[in-house]
Amino acid sequence: MSRIDTPAASRMQTIARNPVMIALVMTLALAGCASKKNLPNDAAGLGLGAGAATPGSQQDFTVNVGDRIFFDTDSTSIRADAQATLDRQAQWLAKYPNYGITIEGHADERGTREYNLALGARRAAATRDYLVSRGVPGNRMRTISYGKEKPVAVCDDISCWSQNRRAVTVLGGAGS
């Protein structure tokens, strides 16, 4: 076996013969892989990386509060899980009073266009009414219905339909 005589090869041979150097290199390599960045709002655990939500932003509202609620088939009743989300929205809107919102009502693909536009309007209105009951001024909100025109899931089964029966709260509507 021939020996390579270059400065880099010489350094590698020195490191390879020194067990302390091997241990140091391995420790540094493992420590670099195992470190977890210290991010605000426990963003490291949420997979958000360096782009963690800025308080008071649309991203903050969406990620930390929740921007949508879901409805049962052919219903405008606010479910218990939706009430919890809307309560958080009302608290957030009280904390950031400069924002107005638009509440978008949606429906699944079943039914006529006209029926689903009306259903989406009733869902948006029910959402608005709930927020008003929690202290959000009505003049900070507007509603719109998209009916079945803007599905988030497109397929022909109940799992898709349930995702499309929703009301979405978007910052920047009335009053902002």
Swiss-Prot record:
Topology versus the membrane: Lipid-anchor
Give UniProt keywords alphabetically: Cell cycle, Cell division, Cell outer membrane, Lipoprotein, Membrane, Palmitate, Signal
Domain OmpA-like per the UniProt entry, residue ranges: 58-175
Superkingdom of the organism of origin: Bacteria
Q: Give the signal peptide range.
A: 1-32
InterPro entries hit by this protein: Bact_OuterMem_StrucFunc, OMP_bac, OmpA-like, OMPA-like_CS, OmpA-like_sf, Pal, Pal_lipo_C
Which PROSITE patterns is this protein grouped with?
A: OMPA_1, OMPA_2, PROKAR_LIPOPROTEIN
> Pfam families attached here?
OmpA
Q: Which residue numbers carry lipidation of type N-palmitoyl cysteine?
A: C33
Q: Where in the cell is it found?
A: Cell outer membrane
| A GO CC term assigned to this protein in UniProt | cell outer membrane
One GO biological process this protein is involved in is:
cell division
Lipid moiety-binding region (S-diacylglycerol cysteine):
C33
Q: Which family does it belong to?
A: Belongs to the Pal lipoprotein family.
Q: What function does this protein fulfil?
A: Part of the Tol-Pal system, which plays a role in outer membrane invagination during cell division and is important for maintaining outer membrane integrity.
What does the subunit section of this Swiss-Prot or TrEMBL entry state? The Tol-Pal system is composed of five core proteins: the inner membrane proteins TolA, TolQ and TolR, the periplasmic protein TolB and the outer membrane protein Pal. They form a network linking the inner and outer membranes and the peptidoglycan layer.
Q: What is this protein called?
A: Peptidoglycan-associated lipoprotein
Species this protein is from:
Rhizobium meliloti (strain 1021)
Phylogenetic placement of the source organism: Bacteria, Pseudomonadati, Pseudomonadota, Alphaproteobacteria, Hyphomicrobiales
Name the gene for this chain.
Answer: pal
